[in-house]
């Protein structure tokens, strides 16, 4: 590969030296120099092949007809809520069908709720599986749900719509999910000091509601800083959401909804949001649908985990998961934007995908390996042993999903760079995730791994297994490129460059006028990362197609990326690995 690159560079220089269409004959001296350069390049290429031998490869493309379809009304238009669900569906041979982009939300602009309801009503067919965001169908997306209100009349109209949808298509199964408001006040409460006081007040009230001792004088001092109107708007948001979710629980009880997931977004251990959560827990326990209603932490990953749960349910498959930690303390660690520990979150997500936890890796279909690095707690020392443990798992061909969490969301803490330095075969992981919160990353890793296992069930043909393996590897490489290379290495330099250009808030960019420049900067950095990464043994390592005697390898990797919303917080990345069969 290096040999060909050098030759191409030489030819490019030669082309630039000529101004006419026909090549000017080279002098004897130049021909000699060119020949010497080619011989040196050939020697370098042979040396490279000697220390990095390449297996015989036969290029192969994935060809598989979908085995079923899933209708998706996403939480919002961001990739984790929409594009990633579709990519995960391809692993298990499911065609995930989402509404046209014109009906969806875009950042602070809400989706067309009437248009979305009409689309779903026209598209749904007998036997369909539907993953349905209540926030999108009622408010027009997650951000709209945080800021807007839904009257009792609006809520009741949605309930009537869902009942009519179920009556028209009784064999379709509707898996709905609804998000609880977060602790942060709505943007309509915009006074800086008042917002700070309201957040602190909410935390104290939450502690008091949990039966803990608090400084009542401090609580009253904070209350005095908050206007009656702002407090009423803040508390009213939770009351409105609780009433809505109680109606959804009733819809699950009467069979309109096959399953309901209630997610707590950006949680904390104590706050007014938790008061609503406990109220809903009581309502779930008192209902006749408690086996089909799940209360979980997280939001953006819920459609992914529900997809995995649906496929497992259809196949009668309950993945057995062994959970391993890089260090014992990681299990009890509460990571940023979470209300519960890493282990409690992991338990929730295993149950959500329809799995069960087992006590030994030998009894497991899947090992979920978690590292929750915190440089301030000295946990980085555990990474060397984690590399060794992961190497042992892949050598035994044990399906392994790696969750690579970072307390400070920077490149100092993740495990991935150590794996690269040790030539660990990343292609042999079943799943990788390290984005945003614990619930986001654990949910994505479990969803990918569960769907990968579902794609390799005993009744699956060899062609389907191969297609599933390639779809899984494609999603895996996308997660590595985004969750580590972008979110841990590239986002900070990009934000610094934008600030130098005059942007003070990279969460609200004016990409309408600077889209090309910002996107070009992103693509340059991504291309530089890929140029190095695709030469590593970690990427080139062949990997087996489970249940067959075939081995595949990635012989090239490309990707495209842009900003789906006018902010740098996330990117819309599409990875394109090129696969080949490896000769025995």
Q: What are these regions, as identified by a protein language model?
A:
Residues 16-18, 33, 46:
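Intrinsically disordered, low-complexity regions
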Residues 26-39:
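N-terminal Sec-pathway targeting helices
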């Amino acid at each position: 590969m290096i040999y060909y690159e050098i030759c191409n560079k030489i030819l490019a220089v030669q082309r630039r030296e000529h101004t006419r269409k026909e090549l000017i004959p080279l002098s004897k001296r130049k021909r000699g120099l060119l020949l010497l350069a080619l011989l040196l390049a050939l020697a370098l290429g042979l040396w490279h092949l000697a220390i990095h031998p390449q297996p015989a490869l036969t290029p192969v493309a994935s060809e598989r007809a979908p085995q079923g379809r899933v209708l998706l009304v996403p939480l919002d238009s961001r990739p984790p809520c929409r594009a990633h669900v579709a990519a995960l569906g391809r692993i298990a041979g499911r065609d995930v069908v989402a509404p046209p982009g014109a009906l969806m939300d875009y950042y602070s602009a809400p989706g067309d709720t009437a248009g979305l309801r009409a689309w779903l009503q026209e598209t749904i067919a007998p036997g369909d599986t539907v993953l349905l965001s209540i926030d999108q169908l009622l408010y027009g997306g997650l951000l709209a749900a945080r800021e807007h209100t839904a009257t009792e009349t609006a809520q009741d109209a949605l309930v009537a719509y869902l009942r009519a949808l179920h009556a028209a298509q009784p064999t379709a199964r509707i898996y709905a999910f609804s998000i609880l408001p977060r602790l942060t006040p709505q943007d309509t409460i915009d006074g800086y000091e008042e917002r700070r006081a309201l957040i602190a007040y909410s935390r104290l009230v939450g502690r008091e509601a949990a039966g803990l001792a608090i400084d009542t004088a401090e609580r009253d001092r904070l209350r005095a800083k908050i206007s009656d109107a702002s407090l009423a708007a803040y508390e009213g948001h939770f009351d409105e959401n609780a009433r809505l979710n109680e109606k959804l629980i009733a819809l699950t009880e009467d069979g309109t909804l096959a399953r309901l997931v209630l997610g707590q977004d950006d949680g904390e251990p104590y706050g007014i949001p938790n008061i609503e959560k406990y109220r809903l827990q009581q309502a779930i326990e008192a209902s006749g649908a408690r086996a089909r209603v799940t209360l979980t932490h997280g939001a953006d990953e819920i459609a992914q985990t529900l997809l995995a749960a649906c496929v497992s349910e259809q196949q009668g498959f309950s993945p057995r998961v062994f959970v391993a930690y890089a260090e014992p303390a990681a299990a009890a660690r509460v990571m940023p934007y979470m209300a519960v520990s890493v282990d409690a979150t992991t338990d929730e997500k295993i149950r959500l995908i329809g799995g069960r936890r087992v006590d030994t890796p030998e009894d497991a279909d899947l090992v979920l390996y978690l590292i929750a690095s915190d440089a301030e707690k000295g946990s980085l020392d555990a990474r060397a042993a984690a590399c060794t443990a992961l190497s042992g798992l892949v050598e035994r061909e044990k399906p392994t999903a790696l969750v690579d969490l970072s307390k400070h969301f920077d490149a100092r803490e993740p495990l991935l760079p150590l794996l690269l330095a040790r030539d660990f075969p990343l292609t042999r992981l079943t799943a990788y995730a390290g984005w945003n919160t614990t619930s986001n990353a654990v949910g994505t890793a479990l969803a990918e791994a569960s769907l990968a296992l579902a794609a390799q069930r005993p009744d699956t043909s060899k062609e389907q297994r191969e297609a599933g393996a390639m779809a899984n590897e494609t999603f895996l490489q996308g997660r590595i490129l985004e969750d580590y290379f972008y979110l841990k290495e590239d986002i900070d330099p990009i934000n610094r460059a934008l600030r130098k250009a005059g942007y003070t808030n990279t969460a609200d960019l004016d990409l309408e006028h600077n889209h090309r420049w910002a996107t070009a900067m992103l693509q340059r950095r991504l291309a530089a990362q890929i140029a190095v990464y695709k030469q590593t043994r970690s990427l080139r390592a062949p990997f087996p197609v489970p249940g067959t005697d075939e081995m595949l390898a990635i012989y090239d990797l490309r990707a495209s990326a842009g900003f789906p919303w006018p902010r740098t917080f996330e990117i819309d990345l599409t990875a394109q690995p090129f696969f080949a069969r490896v000769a025995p």
